[in-house]
Design a protein with these regions (language model features):
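Short, basic/hydrophobic alpha-helical segments
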Residues: 42-51, 104-107, 142-156
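A domain-level signal for caspase-like cysteine endopeptidase catalytic cores
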Residues: 2-102
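Structured partner-binding subdomains within large eukaryotic complex subunits
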Residues: 188-189, 209-211
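Catalytic cores of nucleophile-dependent amide-cleaving enzymes
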Residues: 112-197
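Short, charged, surface-exposed secondary-structure boundary motifs
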Residues: 194-203, 211
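Non-Sec secretion/translocation targeting segments of pathogen effectors
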Residues: 1-5, 115, 164, 210-211
């Protein structure tokens, strides 16, 4: 008897938003005027995957503390909103309270055929927390030097498609991802802009998409 085929998984990771009260102090360089930038980008991605394969297995990993804090700030239950969104799209929601938990969730989703990251980043790290615990700083991140320790290479399919919609990923982290996991990680060389998600489109990069 042939062994049963192992169902592949599409993984979407959503980082956290900043506190609006802190970001307003930064004037024209403020981030995250809308709490749902990364959530909306995730649902656009989910819909895109399901349009191609209605039965696709999708795991949505969301950094929870930021949405709890932003929700308290604005008097809204954003955690419930995200939970209801996951139910609507019939995807598996995995809450992560730390960067390490988020990475473990990716490893458990094996075999991963695609990985999408929506959130803040620098050239060297994906920042699941940004300007939420500390203004203009991160307390939970996935640094490029830790990729090989945080992610299992075997968790990804040999031809897995990986892309980061964070800022500046293409300048360094893409190369580190390739070195550690043997897979291309598409990333932009400049900032990424999330205003297109309001029109149902993926975020745009101000620079070149490279891997």
């Amino acid at each position: 008897m042939a062994a049963p085929l192992c169902r592949s998984t599409e993984v979407i990771m959503a980082g956290g938003v900043a506190l609006k009260s802190w970001e307003h102090l930064r004037g024209p360089v403020a981030h995250d005027n809308w709490w749902a930038n990364f959530v909306r980008a995730s649902t656009i991605c989910i819909a895109s995957i399901q349009a191609k394969d209605p039965k696709a297995s999708i795991v949505w990993i969301v950094y929870r503390p930021a949405y709890i804090a932003r929700g308290k700030e604005e008097g809204k239950d954003y955690v419930r909103n995200i939970r209801e969104t996951a139910t609507k799209y019939k995807v598996k929601l995995v809450w992560a309270d730390t960067a390490e938990q988020a990475c473990r969730a990716v490893n458990k989703a094996a075999p991963v055929t695609s990985f999408y990251y929506f959130g803040h980043s620098t050239a060297h790290a994906m920042m699941l927390d940004y300007s939420n615990d500390i203004i203009a700083a991160s307390t939970q991140w996935i640094h490029e030097k830790d990729i090989g320790q945080l992610f299992r290479k075997e968790a990804f399919a040999p031809n897995a498609y990986c892309i980061s919609y964070g800022c500046y990923t293409g300048n360094s982290m893409s190369a580190s991802w390739q070195k550690a996991l043997g897979l291309p990680l598409w990333g932009n060389t400049e900032s990424t802009r999330y205003y297109p998600v309001g029109d149902g489109k993926f975020p745009e990069g101000a620079g070149k998409w490279v891997h």
